[in-house]
Amino acid sequence: MASTSYDYCRVPMEDGDKRCKLLLGIGILVLLIIVILGVPLIIFTIKANSEACRDGLRAVMECRNVTHLLQQELTEAQKGFQDVEAQAATCNHTVMALMASLDAEKAQGQKKVEELEGEITTLNHKLQDASAEVERLRRENQVLSVRIADKKYYPSSQDSSSAAAPQLLIVLLGLSALLQ
């Protein structure tokens, strides 16, 4: 048999004890950290799965749904408001255009009224003149009628006014037709 020689690192005894104590300390520290972190994790897990937590989660989800619905309704309301504002602007523009048109129509109507008033004044003057002329001709006609009647009773051969009577009658009829 061959001889075997084992070479061991010779470690002093005191170093081995220090190592064991160090490993034991690290192990205890790790175990302590696991326990310190594990206990709150277990408590958190229990609380997270509790009925109150689930109710809170449901409430949060409902709030999100309601918030989303309200945001949609707000968006629709804002769009509707913008549409109404656009319609109001159109209506205001139309009203302004109609008011301008109405003012123009009023001015034109006032001008027409003034023209008609002037024409009425002119026609009234013509009517007064024609009435005065008719009155004058009526008096002349009466005078001529009296003369004609006198000539029937007192005939005269040199009377030229009897030929003017039919002409005067035609003038009177023409004037009365104009007045009507």
Curated annotation (Swiss-Prot):
Glycans are attached at N65, N92. Residues 68-152 form a coiled coil. Residues 49-161 are extracellular. One of its GO terms (biological process) is response to type II interferon. It is a single-pass type II membrane protein; Lipid-anchor; GPI-anchor. Monoubiquitinated by KSHV E3 ubiquitin-protein ligase K5, leading to its targeting to late endosomes and degradation. The GPI anchor is essential for its antiviral activity. Keywords: Antiviral defense, B-cell activation, Cell membrane, Coiled coil, Cytoplasm, Disulfide bond, Endosome, Glycoprotein, Golgi apparatus, GPI-anchor, Host-virus interaction, Immunity, Innate immunity, Isopeptide bond, Lipoprotein, Membrane, Signal-anchor, Transmembrane, Transmembrane helix, Ubl conjugation. GO terms for cellular component: apical plasma membrane; azurophil granule membrane; cell surface; extracellular exosome; Golgi apparatus; intracellular membrane-bounded organelle; membrane; membrane raft. Induction: By type I interferons. A lipid is attached at S161 (GPI-anchor amidated serine). GO terms for molecular function: identical protein binding; metalloendopeptidase inhibitor activity; protein homodimerization activity; RNA binding. Residues 1-20 are cytoplasmic. Changing C63A: Prevents homodimerization and inhibition of SARS-CoV, HCoV-229E, and HIV-1 viral particles production ex vivo. It is found in: Golgi apparatus, trans-Golgi network; Cell membrane; Membrane raft; Cytoplasm. InterPro entries: BST2 (IPR024886). It comes from the Eukaryota. Residues 162-180 form a propeptide. Its main location: Golgi. Belongs to the tetherin family. Parallel homodimer; disulfide-linked. May form homotetramers under reducing conditions. Isoform 1 and isoform 2 form homodimers and also heterodimers with each other. Dimerization is essential for its antiviral activity. Interacts (via cytoplasmic domain) with ARHGAP44. Interacts with MMP14 (via C-terminal cytoplasmic tail). Interacts with LILRA4/ILT7. Interacts with RNF115. (Microbial infection) Interacts with ebola GP protein. IFN-induced antiviral host restriction factor which efficiently blocks the release of diverse mammalian enveloped viruses by directly tethering nascent virions to the membranes of infected cells. Acts as a direct physical tether, holding virions to the cell membrane and linking virions to each other. The tethered virions can be internalized by endocytosis and subsequently degraded or they can remain on the cell surface. In either case, their spread as cell-free virions is restricted. PANTHER family: BONE MARROW STROMAL ANTIGEN 2. The extracellular coiled coil domain forms an extended 170 A long semi-flexible rod-like structure important for virion retention at the cell surface and prevention of virus spreading. This is Bone marrow stromal antigen 2. It comes from Homo sapiens. The gene is BST2.
